[in-house]
Swiss-Prot record:
Pfam families: DAP_epimerase. It comes from Haemophilus influenzae (strain PittEE). Keywords: Amino-acid biosynthesis, Cytoplasm, Isomerase, Lysine biosynthesis. The gene is dapF. Belongs to the diaminopimelate epimerase family. This is Diaminopimelate epimerase. Pathway: Amino-acid biosynthesis; L-lysine biosynthesis via DAP pathway; DL-2,6-diaminopimelate from LL-2,6-diaminopimelate: step 1/1.
């Protein structure tokens, strides 16, 4: 099987062309390939498939390192766009793809940046999914070690966002897995820890479900900005600094799609026998 190793701000991926080669992965195979000592090593596996809808260009599938399939990965979306362009699978600047939970448009810009239309944030608790009687800007979550206030939103996948005073000392290692597996998130959740520098600049760490803390999480950056805007803490254009680098997030509020812009880097191509 041919593959490419790529990363978006240090969030690393193996990307596989499922259009021109036949590929099938079991969860066990994915876990073996994801192993950084005995396999290739990655945060997520991305598969490019032929479109299910003839009006779209591709179908986009995402698997976490633990073998679980998820419906969204923002950093992966940028790498997906870079991959299909580099491999000559398309020459379009605007690439329309489907995912498990909807469609998105990936735009390849001339300055090596990829702009992704992430769609509208979803706030209705049942659709996140999150257990709550109604939408609120802040929810109280109790864990074994502390009670936190968080915002909850879906960016095609579930996120909770906790505001912290100092991103460096935030208790991500202990609190992250407790939030990820909290009973009020029936499909688990990506936990974001956000420090607000000013209304147009935040710092963020994300503990991703099925992957742990990563160098960057594109949908997590989108979720943090969306929550901050809904809470009246942020403006419409925000720079998000993650451990692996920075993203620009734009959102004009309810009823509008959210946009993420950032880099996508090709590292190497390889071949492996499954």
């Amino acid at each position: 099987m041919q593959f490419s190793k790529m990363h978006g701000l240090g969030n690393d991926f193996v990307v596989v062309d499922g259009v021109t080669q036949n590929v099938f992965f079991t969860p066990e195979t994915i876990r073996r390939l994801a192993n950084r000592h005995c396999g290739i090593g990655f945060d997520q596996l991305l598969i490019v498939e032929a479109p299910y809808d003839p009006e779209l260009d591709f179908h986009y599938r995402i698997f976490n390192a633990d073998g679980s399939e998820v419906s969204q990965c923002g950093n992966g979306a940028r790498c997906f766009a870079r991959f299909v362009t580099l491999k000559g699978l398309t020459n379009k600047k605007d690439i329309a793809v489907s995912t498990q939970k909807g469609n998105m448009v990936l735009t390849v810009k001339d300055d090596n940046q990829i702009r992704v239309n992430m769609g509208e944030p979803i706030w209705e608790p049942a659709k996140i999914p999150f257990t709550a009687n109604k939408f609120e800007k802040n929810y109280i979550l109790r864990t074994d070690i502390q009670t936190v206030l968080c915002g909850a939103v879906s960016i095609g996948n579930p996120h909770c966002v906790v505001q912290v005073d100092d991103i460096q000392t935030a208790n991500v290692e202990q609190l992250g897995p407790l939030l990820e597996n909290h009973e009020r998130f029936p499909e688990r959740v990506n936990a974001g820890f956000m420090q607000i520098i000013n209304k147009e600049h935040i710092k963020l760490r994300v503990y991703e479900r099925g992957a742990g803390e990563t160098q960057a999480c594109g949908s997590g950056a989108c979720a943090a900005v969306a929550v901050g805007i809904m809470q009246g803490l942020l403006n419409n254009n925000v720079q998000v600094d993650l451990p692996g680098g920075s993203l620009m997030i734009e959102w004009n509020g309810v009823g509008h799609p959210l946009y993420m812009t950032g880099e996508a880097t090709h590292i190497y191509d390889g071949f492996i026998t499954l």
